[in-house]
Design a protein with these regions (language model features):
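Long, low-complexity intrinsically disordered regions
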Residues: 74-75
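Alpha-helix N-cap/helix-start motif at helix boundaries, enriched for small hydrophobics
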Residues: 86-88
Length: 218
């Protein structure tokens, strides 16, 4: 399992194209918050911490599926002394490592918005960040099933449509409900409910992906 995890992490961060994508995304986001007053405000905080970085954490599988399809690695790894459940589990563990890394990177931005831009207080920022963390895990669970089921090309289309849908939902929430009202919502209730949902969805996601993978390679 460790070999597959390391292979996936290598493909995600050491292949030039993927590394450039990661660096470009992070540098662009950092630069945008530095030069744009809008992005330094509460809207930018919500967009980055609750939506953008949590969703970026689940992109490792897309990168590895793309490489695996090119090299037909799915067939090769079936010859390893690993069960199909261990192969699928290794994909999830590698993805969760990246998800955890993006969670920490997102927390750095929380500190920047609190102590640098002084956009939000730490008391309000931490629960909001928590919602982003849990929301990212929920998106992770859904997107991993999508990539195991659809493959790389259709999976990319799914990711694009999902991102468009999430951005539209974010904008509608902000402008229909109001930014102040959203920030004042009792976030502990959201986090508690979403934690349970995330845990359940992650378990369901793993077993669905395992079933899909087993059916494809039976």
């Amino acid at each position: 399992m460790r070999g597959i995890i390391l292979k996936d992490l290598y493909e995600g961060f050491c292949i030039k194209k993927n590394l450039i994508n990661w660096l470009a995304s992070m540098i662009f986001t950092s630069a945008l918050t530095a030069i744009s007053e809008f992005m330094r405000g509460a809207y930018g905080f919500l967009l980055i911490v609750v939506l953008l970085f949590p969703v970026m954490g689940s992109t490792l599988l897309q990168m590895t599926v793309e490489q695996d399809e090119k090299a037909e690695f799915d067939r090769i790894q079936l010859t390893y002394p690993l069960s199909k459940s261990e192969i699928v589990l290794s994909k999830y563990l590698g993805g969760l490592i990246v998800q955890g890394g993006m969670t920490l990177y997102s927390f750095v931005f929380v500190l920047i918005y609190v102590y640098g831009y002084r956009t939000i207080t730490l008391e309000d920022a931490l629960p909001t960040w928590g919602i982003g963390v849990v929301g990212g895990v929920i998106y992770f669970a859904v997107s991993y099933v999508a990539y195991f089921w659809l493959g790389n090309l259709k999976g990319v289309i799914f990711t694009f449509l999902a991102m468009v849908g999430l951005v539209i939902a974010f904008l509608l929430s902000v402008f229909n409900i109001g930014l102040e009202e959203i920030m004042q919502v009792e976030k502990s209730i959201w986090i508690s409910g979403c934690l349970v949902m995330a845990a359940v969805l992650m378990v369901i996601s793993y077993f669905l992906s395992l079933k899909i993978y087993t059916k494809k390679h039976s």
